[in-house]
Amino acid sequence: MGTPEGIDVITVVISEAPYGQERAYTALRFALTALVEGEEVKIFLIEDGVFLGKKGQNPDEVPNYLELLEQCIEQGAEVKACGPCSKARGLSEEDFIEGVELATMHDLVNWVKESDNVIFF
């Protein structure tokens, strides 16, 4: 898989929108923890999860999920958002923060094949 011995590749698939429930928050906390522990993490945003990568989030009285996603990217996570899912929700590449790339199901399939573990939120 191309990673040093002892390092797992973990793909985290997030389908939940931010702020409606805590699944997306839990997914990002999981991903950040895995990164801090030295694992290789790939985050795929799908369905309403694509809103996690949208610029300009500034929620009141709850943790800012976008800041967590940015921390994951800073720690080395590769992040992709489903292009068709984004388009269906009125989002284009310009709507996403730096470090989030639009992708396809082919990209997700390749990540799953390359991963030691896949977790779906």
Swiss-Prot record:
<dbReference type="InterPro" id="IPR003787">
    <property type="entry name" value="Sulphur_relay_DsrE/F-like"/>
</dbReference>
<dbReference type="InterPro" id="IPR027396">
    <property type="entry name" value="DsrEFH-like"/>
</dbReference>
<dbReference type="GO" id="GO:0005829">
    <property type="term" value="C:cytosol"/>
</dbReference>
<protein>
    <recommendedName>
        <fullName>Uncharacterized protein MK0008</fullName>
    </recommendedName>
</protein>
<comment type="similarity">
    <text>To M.jannaschii MJ0989.</text>
</comment>
<dbReference type="Pfam" id="PF02635">
    <property type="entry name" value="DsrE"/>
</dbReference>
